[in-house]
């Protein structure tokens, strides 16, 4: 629900978001898309140009102004990753009843940056903030690797030693690369008792404004938890959390924008 008196701000945001994806748009194109009153739209566009949010070229087309970049850089400069992740992770852990982790890359390892336990989850001392993890045996590691470029993947595969921990551990680099490709295609990673027996983990990547993956989140539980169709419900909770954090880091998905409509 839009707060009273905020219509102009909401309209400005929709115009900026639209132009961000199409590159530039004319007055008539914006009028046809949003169906705003003619005079109101023209006045709003003029104000946005005066403030630096839009640039109008000699052909009458509007594009994004440098003001958006300046404000975005200031916001990111002052951003604390934990301010963005804390609430979504708390909600994920509470709704799932499982342990939730935030992880990142450190050299050729993954590292836990945060850990949130649900009141319903079994307390565990097997994971802690600051713990380093081998990339090939963890869902977090796979999620962090799967969205790397092929050149980056070649580097990591050359540097990694695929040490076996259970009979499910990937020890063949060709098979591990295939697993990373499957992970990217389906959008999520799994550690199916590959690091330790009795523990299964799901993970999804977190994207930043440059469509890069620097972080990943995960849910950990025992194999029984994920039995049957339960895995789908956990993946949906995980997806919503990852999207919320990605959005907070400046990521914008074009398809998401198109679904919003006017």
From Swiss-Prot:
Keyword Transcription regulation listed: yes
GO terms, biological process: negative regulation of DNA-templated transcription
DNA-binding region location: 27-46
UniProt KW DNA-binding keyword: yes
Coiled coil location: none
Residues annotated as domain HTH iclR-type: 6-66
Official protein name in the record: Uncharacterized HTH-type transcriptional regulator YjhI
Gene: yjhI
């Amino acid at each position: 629900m839009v707060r009273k008196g905020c219509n102009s701000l909401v309209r400005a945001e929709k115009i900026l978001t639209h132009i961000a994806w199409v590159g530039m748009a004319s007055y008539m194109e914006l009028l046809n898309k949003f169906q705003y009153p003619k005079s109101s739209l023209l006045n709003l566009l003029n104000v946005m140009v005066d403030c630096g949010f839009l640039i109008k070229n000699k052909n009458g087309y509007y594009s994004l102004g440098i003001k958006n970049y300046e404000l975005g850089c200031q916001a990111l400069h002052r951003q604390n990753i934990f301010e963005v992740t804390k609430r979504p992770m708390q909600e994920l852990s509470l709704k799932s009843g499982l342990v939730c982790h935030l992880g990142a890359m450190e050299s050729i390892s993954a590292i836990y940056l945060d850990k949130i336990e649900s009141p319903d989850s079994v307390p565990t001392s097997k994971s802690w903030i600051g713990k380093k993890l081998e990339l090939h045996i963890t869902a977090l590691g796979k999620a962090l690797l799967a969205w790397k470029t092929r050149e980056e993947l070649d580097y990591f595969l050359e540097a990694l030693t695929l040490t076996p921990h259970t009979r499910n551990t990937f020890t063949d680099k060709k098979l591990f690369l295939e697993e990373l490709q499957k992970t990217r295609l389906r959008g999520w990673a799994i550690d199916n008792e590959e690091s330790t027996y009795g523990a299964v983990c799901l993970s999804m990547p977190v994207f930043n404004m440059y469509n890069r993956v620097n972080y990943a989140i995960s849910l950990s539980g025992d194999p029984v938890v994920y039995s049957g169709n339960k895995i789908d419900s956990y993946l949906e909770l995980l997806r919503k959390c990852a999207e919320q954090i990605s959005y907070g880091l400046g990521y914008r998905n074009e398809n998401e924008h198109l679904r919003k409509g006017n």
